Amino acid sequence: MNDYTQQLQGKKDYLKTLFAGLDVPEWEVYESPDKHYRMRAEFRIWHEGGEMFYAMFEKGQKASGASLIRCDRFDAASEAVNCLMPELIAVAAQSAELRNHWYAVEFLSTLSGEMLVTMIYHKRLDDEWMKAAQALQQQLDISVIGRSRGQKIVLKQDYVTETLRVGDRDFHYRQIEGSFTQPNAAVCRKMLEWACRAAEGLGGDLLELYCGNGNFTLPLSRYFRQVLATEISKTSVSAAQWNIEANWIGNIKIARLSAEEFTEAYTGKREFTRLKESGIVLTDYAFSTIFVDPPRAGIDEETLKLVSQFDNIIYISCNPETLRANLDTLTETHTVGRAALFDQFPFTHHIESGVLLKKKIL
């Protein structure tokens, strides 16, 4: 058993133990590549003895020379990131404007090799920095953003466009710097395909909470008459709207509401101008299914009451412990029809999982 297989087996065993006592079917397991799976990476820039290099630090340790890990390459990151790392630091080292007070760097790449680099500084960025950064951007064929306290300078664009094939169709996603996106594109594609298989034959309308940039929304829209998706982040809502239009999808509407706010609107406790302004009338929908992909804290108690009203629940979780706690409630009214482990974060303790629940027939 190699290192990757061993760590994955540990995650399977953990889930079986955690969900013992619940009637959960055999876990479907979706593996990750064991190298070059992360589309995002971030490093400190360490300056020492006239040299600078990429660095990380021992987990739980204060950032210092004692805890420093030099990173001339980073096998977890995409091949595009690894190819760019030495070129970027070599070019930046030749320019005092780029080199001085350069504190950290963030890479955001795509499967096609498109690259956005955010260079973070402990100094004010001026016109001289912009000239040097524009030359770097052109030389390396990348997009560059400069950040410092109170400053964000976008030289070309602040996003990349990822393309993921799901079933027989390509979906194009604008991924904006600083916004959440699934870091492991290969496993993300498997998650999308699993969710689509779970949705097959359900019909009716879909409600999605916590939709982000529309990652799941776009492919799932093919399986429902109408989709209403909610998201609180303005940046994510903007990206989701762009993604919907770019993919020529006509049956999705986005409501800029938190899950808690939508619960208030859906139950009639409160009216929201944002819904009216978006032309969204909740009584126009006949929801058969709810899709949720909540933050690590899981679903709050009031939203959980809302979720339990739907015939079908597709639940993607980034925290199996809060999923287990939520299932203790949801399995009072629903049965678990499918369960999946997605190894989105190899060689870490983090586990991404998904379940399909169907309402019990009384």
From Swiss-Prot:
Q: Check the record and name the Pfam families matching this protein.
A: tRNA_U5-meth_tr
Tell me a GO cellular component: cytosol
Listed binding positions for S-adenosyl-L-methionine are: 182, 210, 215, 231, 293
Q: Which CDD domains match?
A: AdoMet_MTases
Q: Per the UniProt record, which residue ranges are transmembrane?
A: none
Enzyme nomenclature, EC number: 2.1.1.-, 2.1.1.35
Which BP terms in the Gene Ontology apply to this protein?
tRNA methylation
Q: What PROSITE patterns does the annotation carry?
A: SAM_MT_RNA_M5U, TRMA_1
Matches recorded under InterPro entries: MeTrfase_TrmA_AS, SAM-dependent_MTases_sf, TrmA_MeTrfase, U5_MeTrfase_fam
Enzyme class, spelled out: transferase
Query: What reaction is this protein's catalytic activity?
Result: uridine(54) in tRNA + S-adenosyl-L-methionine = 5-methyluridine(54) in tRNA + S-adenosyl-L-homocysteine + H(+); uridine(341) in tmRNA + S-adenosyl-L-methionine = 5-methyluridine(341) in tmRNA + S-adenosyl-L-homocysteine + H(+)
Q: Which SUPFAM superfamilies match?
A: S-adenosyl-L-methionine-dependent methyltransferases
The UniProt GO MF terms for this protein read: rRNA binding; tRNA (uracil(54)-C5)-methyltransferase activity, S-adenosyl methionine-dependent; tRNA binding
Q: Where is the active site?
A: 318, 352
Q: What keywords are assigned to this protein?
A: Methyltransferase, S-adenosyl-L-methionine, Transferase, tRNA processing
Q: Which NCBIfam families match?
A: trmA_only
Its family remark reads: Belongs to the class I-like SAM-binding methyltransferase superfamily. RNA M5U methyltransferase family. TrmA subfamily.
HAMAP family for the chain: RNA_methyltr_TrmA (MF_01011)
Q: What biological function has been recorded for the protein in this entry?
A: Dual-specificity methyltransferase that catalyzes the formation of 5-methyluridine at position 54 (m5U54) in all tRNAs, and that of position 341 (m5U341) in tmRNA (transfer-mRNA).
Which PANTHER family does the entry link to? TRNA/TMRNA (URACIL-C(5))-METHYLTRANSFERASE (PTHR47790), TRNA_TMRNA (URACIL-C(5))-METHYLTRANSFERASE (PTHR47790:SF2)
Q: What is this protein called?
A: tRNA/tmRNA (uracil-C(5))-methyltransferase
- Organism of this sequence: Neisseria gonorrhoeae (strain ATCC 700825 / FA 1090)
| Origin organism lineage | Bacteria, Pseudomonadati, Pseudomonadota, Betaproteobacteria, Neisseriales
